[in-house]
């Protein structure tokens, strides 16, 4: 079989050729690696040599600096010697002048014998000064050459340090990239773990939401039953009060009828005075005033409870609005948020069973509970209205306290999980709307209560005015009766005085006067 007939042979040959090419590439890569290693070694050697050269140059620089310092000291010494020589020259000239003056005075000593040694000393000092100046110039040239060599060494050292810094920066950058890769891998693992925990917690929360819905429905039915019983008790109490008032009115009317019947066959002077009737009416009026005062106190307490409830509802509404605004501050991408809300809704709607409900069923239960909370209660009479309003205020405050606690717990759970689903958002929005409606209804009831309080105050004022009128009328009637009695007594005494015909009638009678 030839290579054309057998495809395996061609494949193996192509694979062998590819293997050879890969081996060549591997050898080339190894050669490059070796070249890079040799370059690195050469660079290290060059760095070492440069460091040695720099160290040697620094030593030479130190030595030259020491030499320069020594030369400076020598130069200072020479300058001092020069100054001393100049001072000696001046002293010699002064001595020459003196000698010259003395020679003029006394020609005993020759002038050349004194000047010759001084001139020889001056020449020697001048020669030393010129030699020192030449040494100084040579030292300056040497220092300049040393400084140029030192600058060149500093430039070479700086370039070597820059290369070393570049290499170190590349190595540090590589190490930082490796560390960031490890951190990203750890974060990825941690996020996967948190995602699994969030899914499990969402399932638990959905189950707890269903249980809370059932508990809320059961609590609503129990609260409605208690409210019905309280309303029935208040109705019975109001019926009892109305019957008592009717009985008192019947008694008053019966006493009036009996008084009228008793006074029909009597004279004007012998008629029974309506004091008992007045006292009875006064007692009844005082009783009604006391009842009105009690109703006023009850209405004030109810208004106070309504205001407290209104403040609590406002505070709760504010907290719910802040809670609804709060989740927007979380750092959650929109895609992950939609995925989480879709998972929650899918979990709530896909699973079967009697314990799981849809969002529409939950909205129906919540609206039914809100409707049960906002049911109007029948009122019978003014007192029934007051007491029923008190009962409803107490019931609503208790129920709203429970709702507020439950909502705070739910809000805390939702915020602690760092997510808010569309399901819970709809539910919270429904409850916010219900609370706003409840606040509006409560404001209406408070206004109605205020109007009723004003009407009751007007009635109390009217009753007080009527009582004052009745007291004034009774006082006027009592004064009129006293006047009539006094006039009757005077008439009787005048009649007796006229009928008396005895002589003692002449005696002045004080009654007749």
Swiss-Prot record:
Comp. bias (Basic and acidic residues): 60-80
Region (Disordered) residue spans: 1-20, 60-81, 347-367, 393-413
GO molecular function, one term: microtubule binding
Superkingdom of origin: Eukaryota
Alphabetic keyword roster: Cell wall biogenesis/degradation, Coiled coil, Cytoplasm, Cytoskeleton, Microtubule
GO cellular component annotations of the record: cytoplasm; microtubule
GO BP terms: cell wall organization; cytoskeleton organization; plant-type cell wall biogenesis; xylem and phloem pattern formation
Description of how the protein assembles with itself and partners: Interacts with MAP70.1 and itself.
General remark: Plant silencing MAP70.5 show reduced inflorescence stem length and diameter, and inhibition of cell expansion. Over-expression of MAP70.5 causes epidermal cells to swell, stunted growth and induces right-handed organ twisting.
Name of the protein this chain belongs to: Microtubule-associated protein 70-5
Source organism of the structure: Arabidopsis thaliana
């Amino acid at each position: 079989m030839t290579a054309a007939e057998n495809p395996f042979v061609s494949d193996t040959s192509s694979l062998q050729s590819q293997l050879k090419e890969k081996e060549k590439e591997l050898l080339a890569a190894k050669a490059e690696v070796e070249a890079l290693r040799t370059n690195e070694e050469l660079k290290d050697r060059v760095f070492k040599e440069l460091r040695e050269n720099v160290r040697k140059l620094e030593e030479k620089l130190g030595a030259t600096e020491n030499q320069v310092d020594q030369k400076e000291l020598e130069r200072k010494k020479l300058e001092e010697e020069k100054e001393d020589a100049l001072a000696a020259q001046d002293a010699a000239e002064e001595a020459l002048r003196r000698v010259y003056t003395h020679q003029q005075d006394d020609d005993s000593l020759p002038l050349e014998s004194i000047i010759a040694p001084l001139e020889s000393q001056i020449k020697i000092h001048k020669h030393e000064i010129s030699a020192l100046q030449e040494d100084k110039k040579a030292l300056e040239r040497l220092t300049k050459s040393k400084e140029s060599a030192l600058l060149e060494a500093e430039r070479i050292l700086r370039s070597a340090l820059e290369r070393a810094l570049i290499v170190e920066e590349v190595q540090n950058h590589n190490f930082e990239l490796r560390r960031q890769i490890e951190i990203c891998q750890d974060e990825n693992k941690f996020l996967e773990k948190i995602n699994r925990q969030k899914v499990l917690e969402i399932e638990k929360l959905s189950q707890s939401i269903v249980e809370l819905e059932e508990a809320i429905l059961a609590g609503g039915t129990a609260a409605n039953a208690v409210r019905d019983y309280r309303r029935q008790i208040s109705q019975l109490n109001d019926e009892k009060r109305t019957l008592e008032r009717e009985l008192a009115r019947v008694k008053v009317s019966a006493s009036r009828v009996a008084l009228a019947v008793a006074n029909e066959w009597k004279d004007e002077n012998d008629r029974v005075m309506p004091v008992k009737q007045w006292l009875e009416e006064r007692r009844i009026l005082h009783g009604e005033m006391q009842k009105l005062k009690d109703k006023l106190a009850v209405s004030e307490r109810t208004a106070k409870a309504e205001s407290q409830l209104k403040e609590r509802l406002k505070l709760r509404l504010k907290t719910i609005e802040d809670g609804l605004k709060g989740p927007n501050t979380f750092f959650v991408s929109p895609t992950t948020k939609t995925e989480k809300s879709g998972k929650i809704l899918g979990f709530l709607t896909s699973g079967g069973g009697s314990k799981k409900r849809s969002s529409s069923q939950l909205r129906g239960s919540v609206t039914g509970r809100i409707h049960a909370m906002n049911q109007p209660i029948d009122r019978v009479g003014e007192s029934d209205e007051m007491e029923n309003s008190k009962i409803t205020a107490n019931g609503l405050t208790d129920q709203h306290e429970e709702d507020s606690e439950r909502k705070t717990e739910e809000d805390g759970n939702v915020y602690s999980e760092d997510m808010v689903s569309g399901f819970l958002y709809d539910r919270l929005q429904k409850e916010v709307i219900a609370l706003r409606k409840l606040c509006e209804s409560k404001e209406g009831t408070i206004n109605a209560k205020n109007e009723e309080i004003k009407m009751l105050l007007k009635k109390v004022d009217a009753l007080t005015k009527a009582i004052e009128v009745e007291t004034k009328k009774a006082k006027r009637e009592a004064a009129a009766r006293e006047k009539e009695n006094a006039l009757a007594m005077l008439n009787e005494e005048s009649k007796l005085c006229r009928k008396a015909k005895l002589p003692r009638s002449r005696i002045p009678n004080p009654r007749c006067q």
